[in-house]
């Protein structure tokens, strides 16, 4: 191999320690991951636009270009991060039946800046004892629209869920597809283990530089320069899944922890930039944006989920005003006006 046994052992130990240090698995609960109940009689109605601090959420269909244009008001997004429904996760009351049609309709209307990045979280579907590559047609279509299939990441969700899974290993990951038309350098958000140190030298002053093809040790290209404080994340996103029990604590699907969109927002946007979320759901990306100083422009077709997103935001940021754009009235005032009681 060109390495001594001691050098190989040193490299393996360092790699193992780095993986442990860089893992973003979190054992503590995040209060922001708590989701309010879905209301039987929602306050929100189709066409409503809620101003939520620096963010906007419209109750409307992201496949409708007029809805997206109204929401964006001429603004362009630096990032689209979303987790679309798949595998009959959500009941759209027969508004959209075909998944490809849904995805093409939504992604044809992306209000992106020229260097905008599009990251989409999807999971596996098994039917008749096979993995169904349901995304294939949509991936091909994205390419015809000028969106490069730039990268493919893995979201490591932590330990597998209990169950026998019909003979399969316990699921513990999902995918994040990355599209763009222009590359944008990812932000360096991962702390470096040896920050500030000149780690290319051992204690005795000898070098740990890689050997060349002929077996000789090459020079360190950054000799005399300390290791940087942070680095670009790797392609495995290590974040624990939402801890709620689907069907018990959570009565709507595709709930992911706030830490996931927070990671993506911090990786591919700067504070103050716009993020487009076409499937707002329970408002997870809104919370991540508030936490990181980004501005979300979101659509959600179902009025009850709009209410959930608003209430969830309010329970985490009660000091941030939430008003109906058309009237300037607060969410509570609109609830009394429409339902006769506070929401």
Language-model segments: which ranges?
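S-adenosyl-L-methionine
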Residues: 46-71, 310-343
């Amino acid at each position: 191999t060109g390495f001594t046994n001691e050098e190989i052992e040193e490299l393996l130990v360092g790699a193992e320690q780095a993986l442990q240090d860089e893992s973003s698995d979190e054992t503590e609960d995040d209060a922001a991951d708590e989701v309010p109940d879905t209301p039987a009689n929602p306050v929100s109605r189709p066409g409503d636009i809620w101003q939520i601090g620096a963010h906007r959420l419209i109750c409307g269909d992201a496949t409708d270009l007029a809805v997206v244009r109204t929401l964006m008001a001429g603004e362009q997004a630096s990032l689209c991060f979303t987790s679309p429904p798949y595998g009959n996760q959500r009941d759209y009351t027969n508004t959209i039946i075909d998944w490809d049609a849904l995805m093409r309709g939504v992604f044809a209307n992306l209000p992106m800046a020229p260097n905008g990045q599009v990251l989409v979280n999807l999971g596996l579907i098994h039917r008749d004892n096979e993995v169904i590559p349901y995304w294939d047609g949509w991936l091909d279509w994205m390419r015809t629209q000028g969106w490069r299939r730039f990268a493919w990441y893995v979201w490591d969700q932590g330990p597998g869920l209990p169950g026998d899974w019909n003979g399969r290993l316990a699921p513990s990951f999902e995918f994040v597809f990355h599209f763009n038309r222009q590359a944008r350098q990812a932000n360096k958000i991962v702390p470096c283990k040896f920050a500030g140190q000149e780690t290319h030298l051992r204690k005795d002053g000898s070098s740990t530089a890689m050997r060349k093809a002929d077996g000789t040790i090459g020079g360190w290209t950054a000799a005399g320069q300390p290791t940087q404080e942070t680095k670009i994340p790797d392609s495995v996103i290590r974040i624990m899944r939402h801890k709620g029990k689907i069907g018990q604590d959570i009565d709507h699907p595709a709930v992911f922890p706030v830490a996931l969109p927070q990671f993506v927002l911090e990786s591919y946007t700067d504070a103050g930039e716009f993020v487009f979320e076409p499937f707002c759901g329970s408002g997870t990306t809104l919370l991540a944006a508030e936490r990181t100083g980004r501005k979300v422009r979101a659509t959600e077709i179902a009025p009850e989920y709009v209410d959930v997103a608003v209430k969830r935001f309010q329970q985490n940021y009660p000091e941030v005003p939430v008003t109906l754009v058309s009237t300037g009235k607060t969410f509570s005032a609109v609830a009394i006006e429409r339902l006769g009681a506070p929401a």
